[in-house]
């Protein structure tokens, strides 16, 4: 659809590089150029990176379908997530809370002068995104005088303009989840004191603005421009049906993702708090109490597993039971031989565990905690050992009832979440270039493959590794495969990081490390033309129908060029946009249906033809009756283009009646009477001769 030059890309040039044909730094993995893009309402929002930095030049908004820049705010370093909140009340219905959120600051206040002042203790946390003196429009003075007791706050940004709307302060720490109406929910478990067990669970809601009710109790969603003290914005705080306890283990590490809270050198034991792993709003919370790494891993670097290790689940579904009821707490024996068990991904029905050293998976029933399948067979090739062992590779994902696993082995596997069975693989058929990642370009013998996104029945794959080499691997692709059978849908030359992707509304947006551009891939608009020559004919004669089907994408490299078949699309894009291959001389166009409506209103199917590499199609047509015809050329659309059609008309005249030959007088022919008279005379003479002969004696 379009490309967006984000940073330096391609080959540097000159002769001062250590390696010939040196490329620019791609940013992997610590200075990503296109980190955390957000797509919302047909707009993609992303940070503009400074030189060798993730952010620094503001945030911009680009139309998802056209690539047009809508606004840029240099005063925002980055945005963390979006929100589409559906507020419902007797007076108000529909999605009205439409925001981008900037998080992670302390005690932000909005002055009556319209100047945002983060305060001296918060400037570094904001990375200067709202420096003192930045005028973001007039807003009222702070109305809340409650002291800030939390170390985090949120700023709401208008997605249409990039301007600050309001703040939410006193936002608690916890695990964030997106609610059923678009609320941002934060949950955590707590205890009475530092030595007590964990006995209560709460849920905070970012839409519970205090006092946001009009007189009479009929509520409306009107946040206004102010600071909102969210210290009381809780949906509920409930007592757990049974307490959750810390565990002490000899195996562990400090850090996030539920790792150990403390270490006692005297005993050699790590203290692990109960930690939420995943929230399924309105359904359940899944957690652990063993400080285990999560996959993608935390980079903790330890091996082995606490024996036993503990998992649990808490009910959030009021129709199933009390909110806060502990559904199950289970301990599991660690596998033999010092295997490291990691917390895998999953859905609301099945959780997964990953055995790192043996590259195996286990399925856990989320309703009971029972193991329902696994361990699976060891994955191959052996390079897959590095699957998700750091937080900077993300070779896995869940969707469509599958656990999708890839990695340094270059093979995508689709594990059935119900059974653990591998329903299909992709990338391991050396005899099929459309189903192989094998290459001599890497030390692994294949392209390390990561799951970048799962959406709309598709799995998007990128080929990269931690700390990508420069120049990048020759031939590495970004690919899209069918999520149910692994069929390759398209591939394009380009290497990327799984962290530099976004997909929504049928469009896939990603950063190409090869040329430093953002690419938007999806179905583009098309245009069809049709003519017939000659336009007026005599019945019995033929006309030649011609026309074109062309790409109308906003990309200047594509607009007005031929629409090409899905089968040839990948190579065509490499040629037209990336200029990385020669013109594919055998590329096919698209199918065009030719029909006509005759003078009597009858529909006539003429034929289905295929356009060529220039977009042209043609077909002879011989009308059968006289009168006016409408001829319709229809391109029904494809995986690459939207539909279009065109009409033209011809006239058919009745043939004039045949002209009779001229009539001339017929001359009298005397030949036959003369001949006849001669014959009579001859006969008479003969008779006389016969009679004379008879009279002779």
Indicate where each model-derived feature is located.
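Secretory-pathway ectodomains
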Residues: 1-538, 543-572, 577-578, 585-596, ...
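Short tyrosine-centred short linear motifs in exposed loops/low-complexity segments
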Residues: 540, 615, 625-629
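Short, exposed coil/turn segments at beta-strand boundaries within extracellular/luminal domains
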Residues: 602-603, 639-645
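Residue-level recognition of secondary-structure-to-loop junctions
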Residues: 611, 617-625, 635
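C-terminal low-complexity, Ser/Thr- and acidic/Pro-rich disordered "stalk" regions positioned immediately N-terminal
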Residues: 644-669
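Juxtamembrane/start-of-transmembrane alpha-helix segments at the extracytoplasmic/lumenal side
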Residues: 665-679
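C-terminal membrane-anchoring or membrane-association module
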Residues: 684-697
């Amino acid at each position: 659809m379009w490309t967006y030059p984000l940073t330096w890309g391609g080959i540097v040039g000159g002769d001062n590089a250590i390696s010939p044909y040196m490329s620019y730094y791609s940013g992997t993995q610590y200075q990503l150029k296109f980190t955390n893009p957000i797509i919302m309402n047909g707009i993609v929002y992303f940070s503009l990176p400074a030189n060798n930095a993730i952010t620094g030049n503001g945030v911009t908004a680009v139309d998802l379908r056209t690539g047009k820049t809508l606004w840029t705010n240099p005063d925002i370093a980055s945005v963390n997530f979006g929100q589409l909140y559906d507020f419902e009340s007797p007076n108000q219905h529909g999605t009205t809370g439409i925001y981008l959120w900037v998080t992670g600051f302390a005690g932000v206040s909005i002055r009556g002068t319209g100047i945002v002042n983060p305060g001296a203790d918060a400037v570094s946390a904001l990375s200067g995104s709202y420096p003192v003196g930045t005028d973001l429009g007039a807003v009222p003075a702070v109305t809340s005088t409650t002291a800030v007791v939390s170390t985090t706050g949120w700023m709401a940004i208008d997605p249409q303009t990039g301007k600050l709307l309001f703040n939410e302060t006193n936002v608690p720490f916890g695990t964030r989840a997106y609610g059923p109406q678009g609320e941002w929910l934060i949950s955590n478990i707590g205890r009475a004191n530092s030595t007590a067990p964990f006995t209560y669970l709460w849920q905070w809601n970012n839409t519970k603005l205090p006092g946001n009710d009009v007189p009479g109790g009929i509520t409306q969603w009107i946040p206004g421009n102010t600071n909102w003290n969210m210290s009381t914005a809780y949906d509920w705080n409930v007592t757990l049906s049974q307490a959750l306890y810390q565990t002490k283990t000899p195996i562990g590490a400090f850090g996030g993702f539920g790792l150990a809270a403390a270490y006692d050198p005297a005993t050699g034991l790590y203290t692990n708090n109960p930690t939420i792993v995943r929230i399924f709003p309105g359904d359940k919370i899944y957690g652990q109490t063993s400080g285990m790494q999560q996959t993608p891993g935390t980079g903790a670097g330890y091996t082995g597993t606490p024996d036993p290790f503990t998992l649990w689940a808490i009910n959030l579904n009021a129709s199933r039971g009390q909110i806060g009821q502990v559904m199950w707490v289970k301990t599991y024996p660690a596998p033999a031989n010092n295997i490291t068990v990691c917390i895998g991904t999953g859905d609301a029905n099945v959780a997964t565990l990953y055995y790192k050293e043996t590259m195996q998976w286990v399925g856990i029933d989320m309703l009971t905690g029972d193991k329902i399948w696994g361990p699976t067979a060891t994955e191959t090739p052996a390079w897959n050992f590095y699957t998700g062992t750091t937080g900077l590779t993300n070779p896995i994902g869940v969707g469509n009832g599958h656990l999708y696993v890839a990695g340094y082995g270059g093979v995508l596997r689709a594990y059935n979440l119900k059974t653990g069975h591998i329903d299909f693989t992709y990338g391991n058929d050396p005899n099929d270039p459309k189903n192989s990642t094998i290459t001599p370009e890497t030390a692994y013998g294949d392209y390390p493959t990561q799951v970048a996104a799962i959406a709309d029945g598709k799995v998007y794959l990128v080929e990269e590794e931690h700390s990508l080499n420069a120049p990048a691997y020759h031939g590495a692709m970004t690919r899209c495969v069918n999520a149910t059978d692994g069929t390759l849908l398209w591939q394009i030359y380009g290497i990327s990081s799984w962290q530099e992707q976004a997909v929504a509304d049928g469009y896939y947006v990603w950063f190409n490390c090869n040329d430093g551009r953002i690419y938007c891939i999806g179905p583009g608009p098309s245009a069809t033309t049709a003519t017939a020559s000659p336009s007026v004919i005599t019945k019995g004669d033929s006309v030649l129908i011609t026309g074109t089907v062309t790409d109308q994408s906003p990309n200047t490299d594509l607009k007005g060029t031929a629409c090409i078949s899905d089968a040839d699309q990948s190579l065509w894009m490499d040629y037209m946009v990336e200029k990385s291959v020669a013109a594919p001389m055998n590329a096919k166009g698209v199918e065009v249906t030719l029909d006509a409506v005759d003078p009597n209103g009858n529909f006539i199917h003429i034929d289905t033809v295929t356009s060529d590499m220039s977009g042209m199609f043609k077909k002879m047509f011989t009308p059968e009756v006289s009168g006016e015809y409408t001829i319709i050329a229809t391109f029904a659309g494809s995986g690459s283009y939207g539909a279009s059609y065109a009409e033209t008309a011809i006239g058919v005249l009745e043939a004039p009646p045949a002209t009779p030959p001229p009539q001339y007088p017929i001359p009298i022919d005397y030949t036959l009477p003369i001949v006849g008279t001669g014959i009579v005379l001859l006969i008479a003479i003969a008779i006389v001769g016969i009679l004379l002969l008879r009279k002779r004696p």
